[in-house]
């Protein structure tokens, strides 16, 4: 993946400022192109990461029951409008043959996937698929809830509305009780 081109971003931001009728040389804006480039490097850092890398450390435990990390806060940037959306991810999996990962690794994978121009549906599926590929669990269920600024500050202008997406893999695809257990624990 190519590195962030700071100079190109700075140039583009100057063009945007000029295109909306602003003076990029006025006091409050003179450093804005540099700040935006630095911010993009941070908020799009996930482009440089493979979420599966966070699951390289695994532990062998005699545990094949549900593991759920809920309310993992995240932010991302809508790839359609380049405005933020943010919310919480809930990640559940059922280990196979005692193959578990550190709980923080689930949160790190969420962050790696979210920190790129993205769609919420893709975040949800990519997290689930990364866990399946890396840990080979009996099942994975990911639920993502988010508020999208593209619906809050433009277009329909509906602040507070949330989008919920799910991805189910393995036993969660066929076992309604397993899905219901995860959903009830998320609400608890």
From Swiss-Prot:
Top-level taxon of the source organism: Bacteria
Pathway connected to this protein: Cofactor biosynthesis; 7,8-dihydroneopterin triphosphate biosynthesis; 7,8-dihydroneopterin triphosphate from GTP: step 1/1
Catalysed transformations (reactions): GTP + H2O = 7,8-dihydroneopterin 3'-triphosphate + formate + H(+)
InterPro entries: GTP-CH-I_C/QueF, GTP-CH-I_N, GTP_CycHdrlase_I, GTP_CycHdrlase_I_CS, GTP_CycHdrlase_I_dom
An annotated GO BP: one-carbon metabolic process
Gene Ontology molecular function: any one: GTP binding
Top-level class of the enzyme under EC nomenclature: hydrolase
UniProt GO cellular component terms: cytoplasm
Keyword Hydrolase: yes
Keyword annotations of the record: GTP-binding, Hydrolase, Metal-binding, Nucleotide-binding, One-carbon metabolism, Zinc
Similarity field: Belongs to the GTP cyclohydrolase I family.
The protein, known as: GTP cyclohydrolase 1
Organism of provenance: Geobacillus kaustophilus (strain HTA426)
